[in-house]
């Protein structure tokens, strides 16, 4: 006598379903326990970063370049690929020539991705140069740091621009 498909699926996968329900239930139980048993003190300095007993100076937030995040993502990607190559190198005798060809194709795809990243400049850390050109290099002057000199230079530059526009 043959079982129906739903009964067959339940018979084969009941252990996984019990495991999944148990894992989700345990996570929920721990979250609820932390919510009910956790402290709720609201002090003035609760959210202030601790700096070895010294009063904090400035903000703890730093703006980082997006290139750092790109490098982190590239590291994770190439690290996972190295993991796959390590698994292949352990089973090289069992995989034979077919496994070698597949690993060679995998390495070629990695190299193509690396060359693409280099080509689009994702790994270039030098600052980009501005394409702006100064129209009249003779009018460029070094400004003084004294406030009176700066205001005089601005008024002279404004009158020169007004004369040029006429």
Swiss-Prot record:
A Pfam family assignment: Oxidored_q4
Keyword DNA repair: no
Bilayer-spanning residue ranges: 16-36, 68-88, 98-118
Chief location category: membrane
Catalytic activity from the UniProt record: a quinone + NADH + 5 H(+)(in) = a quinol + NAD(+) + 4 H(+)(out)
Enzyme class at the top of the EC tree: translocase
Residue numbers spanned by region Disordered: 141-166
Documented EC number(s): 7.1.1.-
UniProt superkingdom: Bacteria
GO terms under cellular component: plasma membrane; respiratory chain complex I
Membrane association type: Multi-pass membrane protein
Intracellular or extracellular location(s): Cell inner membrane
Presence of keyword Signal: no
Keywords, ordered alphabetically: Cell inner membrane, Cell membrane, Membrane, NAD, Quinone, Translocase, Transmembrane, Transmembrane helix, Transport, Ubiquinone
Gene Ontology molecular function: any one: NADH:ubiquinone reductase (non-electrogenic) activity
Purpose of the protein: NDH-1 shuttles electrons from NADH, via FMN and iron-sulfur (Fe-S) centers, to quinones in the respiratory chain. The immediate electron acceptor for the enzyme in this species is believed to be ubiquinone. Couples the redox reaction to proton translocation (for every two electrons transferred, four hydrogen ions are translocated across the cytoplasmic membrane), and thus conserves the redox energy in a proton gradient.
Complex formation: NDH-1 is composed of 13 different subunits. Subunits NuoA, H, J, K, L, M, N constitute the membrane sector of the complex.
HAMAP family per UniProt: NDH1_NuoA
PANTHER family: NADH-QUINONE OXIDOREDUCTASE SUBUNIT A (PTHR11058:SF21), NADH-UBIQUINONE OXIDOREDUCTASE CHAIN 3 (PTHR11058)
Protein family (similarity comment): Belongs to the complex I subunit 3 family.
Protein name: NADH-quinone oxidoreductase subunit A
Organism: Yersinia pestis
